[in-house]
Every structure is written in C-alpha cells, then in structure tokens.
Amino acid sequence: LGNHDWETPGAKPYLDYFTLPGNERYYDFVKGDVHFFAIDSDEREPDGITATSKQAAWLEQALKKSTAAWQIVFMHHPPYSSASHGSSEELRWPYAKWGADLVLAGHDHTYERVEQGGIVYVVNGLGGNRPYPFRQPVPGSVIQYQKRHGAQFIEASKSTLVSRFSTIDRETIDAFSLEAPAKPAP
C-alpha cells in the first residue's frame, strides 16, 4: 500500500476495491519464473515495517520457501532514494540474505537504480504526475533520471532476468540483467 491509500481509515477503499491474496496488505504470487512479494511500506501498517516486524518475519519465511527462479520484492516507499522524498531507512531489510534478487519501489517520481548490500533496488515513479528533483545521491546510486515519464519492463527466464526502463518516446534510459547463480549438483 502507498501513503495515499492509507489517507482513509484503515486503507478501507483500497482494500474493498481490490481482491488480493493473503491479508491484502502484504502477499505473494508467482508469475512464470518469478515469485513476487508485495510488502506494505507505510508506517501505518498494523504489522509494522521494520526488519523485526511481523510483516518482515512473513517475508523472510516466504522468500526462504520460494522455489521460483527469481524472487522480486516490491513496495511503495523506497529503502534507498536520492530524490525529494528520500530513503525510507526502516525498510532496509536484509533482502539479499533472505533470498530476494531485486527490490522495486515507487513514491519518488523518478527513476533510479541503486546497488546496495548485494542487491539491486529500483525506484520507478515516472508513470505519471510531475517528476521530482534529485538531491544528494545515496551510496550505490548507479543511474538517476527524471526528465520524461516512462515504464519499466522486466523479462525473466530460469537463467536470466532483464530489466529495462524506457521513456514514453521508447528511448531506453537504463537496462541491466541478472544471472541466476548456478545450482549445486545433487
């Protein structure tokens, strides 16, 4: 859930409108070779947003149980961001240690790729509204962009995950790939 969803008591309109798995605030689903994990990054989340919260314990266990080729965690508030809203440091959980391959967020109306703690974080809030300015780059910031709206495209196979951010004019601004680690022989 995002900050605007929580502006109504208990995020009720959002939760009434959408039918989502689990408790509907944080949940997971599998699509092809990717296991997606949604977490509620808002400070009003009843189960907490710190690395020791009930929600984090759920994520840690769910990631460790996943058998998909790729595990992607997504949320609204970014753990790392160089833009005007800045980083939500309480969301700097040990995602890589728990088994995540990629962390996606929004909130700041920018595109930024950050590499921290053995994992890639992407902030992509350029789907609409006006872009935000950048401030001081956070450690590990690889690329920052906020000139044109755009979208992120992710393609995954069992061995490779490719992410590409393109503007509405179809100009590719950033692209990166992740290779799945070799599985040990039985």
Regions found by a protein language model. Name each.
Residues S41, M75-P78, H107, S166:
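Short, well-ordered beta-to-alpha junction loops that form the rim of enzyme active sites
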